[in-house]
């Protein structure tokens, strides 16, 4: 992502593309972005591989103005929050994905003013890729279900 300057282009992006296809959604019709605008990583395998590290709260808060500017420009009706970091960036640090995955959530008024946007939070594709096979299959099905629900929310 960092090298290509686009979100979701690696293994997690390929999983997202497959899930979108299985949900009947054309990625070309979506606005896809990252909640955190920089890539923090740890080098492994003699620097050939970069492992993403979860941003801390300060980094999430620092990037929030850019995310809000994007949302105000795009004016989405439904925002799909992929993972806890994205969800907490808009819904607050107390948000728990495990408790609210798949629910229709009201975005705070400062997110997209004068626009009744809702959100649905679901697992980040990279977290699904890290699960063992039986759990991965179930989490993938949940992701597809949540993506289908986001389409239903459009009416």
PLM region spans:
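A polyanion-binding, active-site-adjacent surface
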Residues: 1-155
């Amino acid at each position: 992502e960092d090298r290509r300057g686009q979100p979701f282009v690696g293994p997690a992006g390929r999983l997202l593309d497959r899930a979108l296809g299985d949900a009947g959604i054309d990625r070309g019709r979506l606005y896809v972005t990252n909640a955190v605008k920089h890539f923090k990583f740890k080098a492994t395998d003699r620097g050939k591989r970069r492992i993403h590290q979860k941003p801390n709260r300060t980094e999430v808060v620092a990037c929030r103005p850019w995310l809000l500017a994007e949302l105000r420009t795009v004016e989405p009706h439904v925002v799909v929050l992929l993972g806890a970091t994205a969800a907490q960036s808009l819904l607050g640090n107390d948000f728990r994905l495990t408790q609210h995955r798949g629910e229709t959530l009201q975005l705070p008024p400062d997110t997209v003013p004068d626009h009744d946007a809702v959100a649905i939070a679901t697992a980040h594709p990279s977290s699904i890729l890290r699960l063992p096979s039986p759990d991965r299959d179930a989490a993938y099905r949940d992701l597809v279900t949540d993506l289908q629900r986001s389409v239903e929310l459009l009416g």
